[in-house]
Amino acid sequence: QDTIPVQLTTDGEPNYTFNREDEGKLEGRFGAESTHWIPGSHRFYAVREDNRKVRDLWLINSLSTPYPTLKTYKAELAGDKHVTQYELLIGDVDTREVKKIDINRWPDQYIDILYISKDGKRLYFQRYNRPWNQSDICEVDVETGKVRVVIHEENKPYLDYQMRNVSFLNDGKEILFRSERNGWGHYYLYDTATGNLKNQLTDGIWVAGPVTKIDTIGRKMYFYGYGREKGIDPYYYILYEAQLDRPNAVRLLTPENASHDVSISPSYRYMVDSYSTVSQEPVNVVRNRNGKVIMTLEKPDLQPVYEMGWKAPERFKVKAADGVTDLYGVMWKPADFDSTKVYPIISNVYPGSFFEYVPTRFTINDVYNTRLAQLGFIVITVGHRGGTPMRGKAYHTYGYNNMRDYPLADDKYAIEQLAARYPFIDATKVGIYGHSGGGFMSAAAICTYPDFYSAAVSSAGNHDNRI
């Protein structure tokens, strides 16, 4: 029977299919195929998209021969009445039954498949409402199709998707869950069977970031954190250890004031740590499980680079336009920099809100900034309120409902402070440039402050976020 194709469904049609039609479609969420086997069983699950009511958009291929051709595709725009509808189905190849699971809670919700138990009896998914301020982590009984909510999360104005983490431990018996519910990104451990919170693993006025490794036998997790240690730049990746069975039992493992990139051995006994700053060359060490350095490894020989005139950029700190919030940035100078001269300044920008283009680690040429400085400019990139979840919820969500203007005043005020601090900056010759969201921001900046910015370069700017 394995060699004979068997059709299990008959209701497919264009834009309502189990196997996405990638041609002419925007990048999807589930890949080219949305059907997957459930481990250890004769069942499969499928995520089906219904795009039949989603608006059509069009492209004209003017290079097509012998004449231009029209391409029609489906695309959701902000505020559209009709958007993609998602379905979860479980099929049985023995009974040839395909069952639609009742996953709906909110109109126009979006779903992610998270985990399937090793015995194939339980499937977990996460659903979000359309405003993206509520979500459920749900368990599906594969046999019966019954859905149970394990964790409900609600956070306004919106949930942080960029740094979200949902990890299933001990074959799904526990769930490690990251939340900004107290205003700061922290980790919580739940009992999956009951949905009860077992422990809040991290807490405080700082941000717990990406998890690098989880030791389920030793009952520890290893993760990067930001802003916990006084005197350390809040953008630097600092490695910590937390106990799974004790609340807020957090231990610092990499104390140096630098950004760390750590690889932990399979035994959890050792870790290789490469740490640096924009002006400090990488230091590569081996640490034991307590964070103690037990060996220093090789380091790069950059003397030829310095002999060619290369100069490391400098990190700086200024205030936001509110006069209270600290902002961090990086400054590049020409190789032949002369402090007695005056230089025009260019701000390389990206508004976020999931990422700030403010490097923290050592690099010889950070995109175009080093090269641009050699043309006789002071080049900076500086963070701003609304730019990243690494600084906490209030900082991250500052730009909500103000997509165009929220970063502009901070960029302008940062440049004004630097010009007042450094006589070599000419505040009458200010340029701004960026790509994508940065292109959007640079165009908005010169239109909003035409007497401050002298020139703007906008690359592929998304100037109307309604489309």
Predicted regions and their residues:
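Internal hydrophobic scaffold segments of catalytic domains
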Residues: Q1-P5, G31-R55, E139-D141, Y275-T277, ...
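Short loop/turn segments that connect beta-strands within beta-propeller blades
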Residues: D2-T3, D92-R96, V142-G145, T192-G195, ...
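Beta-propeller fold detector
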Residues: T3-E13, K99-D102, V147-H152, K198-D203, ...
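Predominantly five- to eight-bladed beta-propeller fold
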Residues: P5-H36, Y45-K100, N290-V305, Y357-Y368
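Conserved beta-propeller blade repeats
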Residues: P14-F44, T72-D80, T84-E87, N104-Y128, ...
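Structural motif
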Residues: V54-L59, Q85-E87, W132-E139, G183-Y188, ...
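Serine-hydrolase catalytic core recognition
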Residues: D56, Q126, D261-I467
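Short glycine/serine/proline-enriched coil/turn segments at secondary-structure junctions
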Residues: R130-W132, P157-L159, K230-D233, V278, ...
